[in-house]
């Protein structure tokens, strides 16, 4: 759950300075402008693949929009050709499940039962997905209440100014961190392997650092793929594309607020129709693999820029295991992402990498006990293979 201002800049988000610019042409903003009472809902249009169900909750003070609560959840299943809705073999978005453009889930506090029915009719596990949505709505209502409590205590104008100030503060700290990188031009490239039919994809980045700003150029990156590894970034300075840079900024200064101000000092050019800026009807369920490779090429640029470097690239994308089977206790259908197998982080300049962890996600594999409780499976063992890539 995230709080964004009326200009659609993230004010606070625990994992990333996510931002989605909802200009006046946006169907979301039009919904707020035409009738401010409601909760827009979409599976298609605000994030990077269909499984990320998105809710937006307008926050008003004195009949004026001052902020927007934003929430998303990765739904375990929204239909499509396979349980879990994701397969690297998919070649078009149509195979990945329900596509629903922004529409009001609630109107004047009343549930749009037609939208709920459409969602239920397109999911293998509608009860679980609807439970996730209800949890998001509860969180968004809490955000609305807390923001209005602040407005009652300090005044709406002061709260709006504070939201803007914290974004500007993050921008200032980000520029200071970037200034620690010597001005210059740095190039790095890498490949994504293991794509269908033994295909590979080339990723290229040029990082230009000058006076506390970074300009990125991903020209030379391969065209979008007939596979599910495409990232739909909308040609913006998308957090998934530049994630390595704000990880660097937060490493240099962990007290930097995690909001859209971090991105103000970063500019990127990602050619349209490439694997990092795919266009309709590209499949993108497994887009995390390409986002991870974008992370790696930017890490390569930073390692060139800094005398002692930071760290080597990690093991790449996680292996995701999905189990679709009836619940042994209730008999109801279940679709579980039971584990994400992570190889670990690359070696650092003075120590080994972090074992069994996805550096880009800050995510570890699921404990065996949880897997056995959630499924009918018994795990014989999960082991880490020492030095499976190379020492370090």
Q: Which residues make up each language-model segment?
A:
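Glycine/proline-enriched, intrinsically flexible loops and inter-domain linkers
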Residues: 1-392
